A protein has these predicted regions:
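Conserved Rossmann-like nucleotide-binding pocket used by diverse enzymes
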Residues: 15, 91, 157
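N-terminal helical cap/lid subdomain that shapes the substrate entry/recognition surface
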Residues: 101
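Alpha-helical cap/lid subdomain in secreted, periplasmic
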Residues: 104-233
């Protein structure tokens, strides 16, 4: 199947700043002190396919903020899948600015389709905004529970995240530990740190210092692939 057809964007939504710039011009929505407005732009392609579905559910990191969507790591995963002749279709459900609470609210609608592998990438915006970690943990757990309620056979991959120590070391450490603890408690696959080898490397991030460049996205894709590939049948 043609790569463009296989890479269906179930939901591409961009968080626009007050000045209404395009994604490549705007500041990062992940800055907790900046008020934002959320504008959803929905694009769906409904071509029939017998392929199994891998759904990436996340925030601007998944949505490839500041880049063309083809440069994002979900599309890089699709390219790897296609190169091996595997019958999987990647769906990118990344929403810029998304918190775990927002993800929890929209997940039920996203799961109206059959999903074989669900990759959960949320929490970074919670951490940057200092949201109570009890809420972050509860929301992530609720999303895992909902995926299993919808389809117990869906395999889940949890993408671990880390944040700078702006909120203090206790908060930062507890935030980092949420992901391995939830992965162990729920017996789901864990990507230890989604931005391994990218975070803190200026040349691999946009000017905001948060979102990966195209080269950074390729490294993220390799990090994800190390965990995802063994799951694919």
């Amino acid at each position: 199947m043609d790569r463009v057809l296989k890479f269906r964007y179930f939901l591409v939504a961009l968080l626009l700043w007050n000045c209404g710039e395009t994604p490549k011009q705007q500041k990062t929505e992940d800055t907790p002190t900046t008020k934002t407005e959320e504008t959803n732009s929905v694009a769906t392609e409904t071509e029939e396919t017998d392929d199994a579905v891998i759904l990436f559910f996340g925030n601007s990191l998944t949505a490839a903020y500041g880049l063309d969507t083809e440069e994002g790591f979900p599309n890089q995963i699709q390219l790897k899948i296609d190169s091996l002749g595997l019958n999987y279709t990647v769906i990118n459900s990344g929403l810029s600015g998304e918190t775990t609470a927002g993800g929890r609210n929209r997940l039920d609608w996203v799961l109206n389709q059959e999903v074989d592998i669900f990759v959960l990438e949320l929490g970074a915006n919670d951490g940057l905004r200092g949201i109570p970690l009890t809420e972050t943990r509860a929301n992530l757990q609720a999303m895992i529970d909902l995926v299993r309620e919808k389809n117990p056979e869906t395999r889940i991959v949890l993408a671990g995240m880390q944040i700078p120590p702006n909120m203090g070391m206790e908060y930062t450490t507890e935030f980092r530990n949420i992901y391995p603890e939830l992965a162990k408690a729920n017996d789901v696959a864990l990507i230890p740190f989604l931005l391994e080898g990218v975070a803190g490397v200026p040349e691999l991030n946009l000017e905001d210092g948060i979102h990966p460049t195209a080269d950074g996205q390729k490294i993220v894709a390799n990090t994800v692939w190390q965990v995802l590939k063994p799951i694919l049948k």
